[in-house]
Amino acid sequence: MLWDLSGGMVDQRFLVILCMVAFLAGCTQSPVTASVIVMEMTGAQPVLIWLLISSIIASIISHQFSPKPFYHFAAGCFLQQMQARQAEELRSKTEQEK
């Protein structure tokens, strides 16, 4: 679909790389890191500026939907689950001692 919008003027591989970096930057909200990782994975050093632009835009849009990056959100949920499990174990242990 995106390739059709370009009228076939843009190489499909370039669009795939831009979408890769946008997805990674949107999830991590780390545009520079996402750009460097995708650049190193694909060997796309000549298009680094386009990777940075795409990742910055994706990161800004992602921040509008969720102020926290995905990994911070996931870590918070994991921490809450572990604290609840630990509290339950402590509660059952004190009940057994009675």
Curated annotation (Swiss-Prot):
* Keyword annotations: Cell membrane, Membrane, Transmembrane, Transmembrane helix
> Can you quote a single GO CC term?
plasma membrane
- What is an example of a GO molecular function annotated in this UniProt entry? chloride transmembrane transporter activity
Compartment(s) where it occurs, according to its Swiss-Prot or TrEMBL record: Cell membrane
What membrane topology was assigned to this protein in its record?
A: Multi-pass membrane protein
InterPro entries (alphabetical):
Cl-channel_core, ClC
Q: Which SUPFAM superfamilies match?
A: Clc chloride channel
Q: Where are the transmembrane segments?
A: 14-34, 41-61
Q: Which Gene3D superfamilies does the protein's record reference? A: Clc chloride channel
Disulfide bond is among the record's keywords: no
Protein name listed in UniProt = Uncharacterized protein HI_0633
> Organism source for this protein?
Haemophilus influenzae (strain ATCC 51907 / DSM 11121 / KW20 / Rd)
